[in-house]
């Protein structure tokens, strides 16, 4: 979801650092195992940050395909996610409400697909 370690620790505290995941992609690709990357969920105020570096790292690792996915809030998810994201913006609930109900995902997915293409990657929505 992000190359920013502070943000990653806040929203994905049990996930490996992005650099470690990129190293793993490189190792698998070098061994002839085809890989793909998943960027999701796309989070306002988090995913946009260092997106160029994330896609560049994916391409440099030899991965050719990227899937992107929207934020899908199931019951109880926001209550767990909101405290971690609180430091990103004062108007956080309004930002996320707009993202969930508006064209945010479509626009961000299009931006990611276009940016991915500039890095030689194929990107598409996951669902």
What is each model feature region?
Residues 1-104:
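Conserved AdoMet/S-adenosylmethionine-binding subsite of the radical SAM
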Residues 88-127:
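C-terminal accessory regions of radical SAM enzymes
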